[in-house]
Regions:
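Active-site-adjacent betaalpha module
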Residues: 1-13, 41-45, 65-192
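A short alpha/beta connector and helix-capping loop motif
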Residues: 28-56
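Short, solvent-exposed loop/turn segments at secondary-structure boundaries
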Residues: 27-31, 66-69
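Short acidic, Gly/Ser-rich segments with clustered Asp/Glu that frequently serve as metal-coordination loops
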Residues: 21-26
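Active-site loop/turn elements of alpha/beta-hydrolase fold enzymes
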Residues: 59-60, 144
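N-terminal nucleotide-binding beta1-loop-alpha1 segment
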Residues: 14-19
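Glutamine-centric residue-chemistry signal
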Residues: 20, 56-58
Length: 192
């Protein structure tokens, strides 16, 4: 129901969620991380070329977590171009708006429509999307630009659930207000 049959209208900002080394490289990488990195990297390049606002959210994990601050896993895996005014916002909750300047940054730039990408589909991507919708932003979620882990089997509950299914269920659960683009390459960008 919420998959768009045609490419969505252009957006003015790209929010890159938790593309940190712990989640996209090495043993802890989400399944198909190389494809995700290519897809998100392409989105970032196209956002930069168009003059759209680019914000990277960086999760501050708990002590001992793979994304604990100032550890190799915490580092953003894709480069930030500070010379273009790109913004990095640290967060400690799933929701990228909670106790961050994200709403202020978007409003001050004049953004009304944004695209989200990154990890984890059912956690930080979903929570950030829900708040963006609640704040009346138009939200586009490219189906191939977010990811998560497989859910392991739970005896008496379910078999294992593949990561791709978890991601699809997460985007479906966001309802009809979100625009799900089938492919990230269909998302267009414009200046705010």
């Amino acid at each position: 129901v919420n998959a768009q049959p045609k490419p969505p209208a252009s957006v003015q900002a790209l929010i890159v969620i938790d593309m940190q080394s712990a989640f996209v490289s090495g043993r802890g990488a989400v399944p198909d991380a190389d494809r995700l990195l290519d897809t998100v990297g392409d989105l970032m390049a196209r956002a930069r070329e168009s003059g759209a606002l680019l914000v990277q959210l960086q999760n501050d994990g708990e002590p001992g977590a793979p994304d604990e601050p100032d550890t190799p896993g915490w580092r953003l895996h894709l480069p930030v171009d500070a010379g273009r005014g790109e913004v990095v916002l640290r967060k400690s909750a799933d929701d990228g708006f909670e106790e961050t300047r994200l709403e202020k940054v978007l409003r001050e730039a004049g953004v009304t429509a944004l695209a989200l990408c990154g990890v984890m589909s059912e956690m930080c991507v979903s929570a950030t999307a829900r708040t963006a919708l609640d704040l009346d932003f138009r939200v586009v979620l490219p189906h191939d630009a977010h990811a998560t882990y497989d859910i392991p089997a739970a005896e008496g509950i379910s078999d294992a659930v593949p990561a791709a299914v978890v991601s699809r269920v997460a985007e479906w659960a966001l309802g009809d207000e979100i625009e799900v683009a089938a492919r990230a390459c269909d998302v267009g960008f414009t200046k705010p």
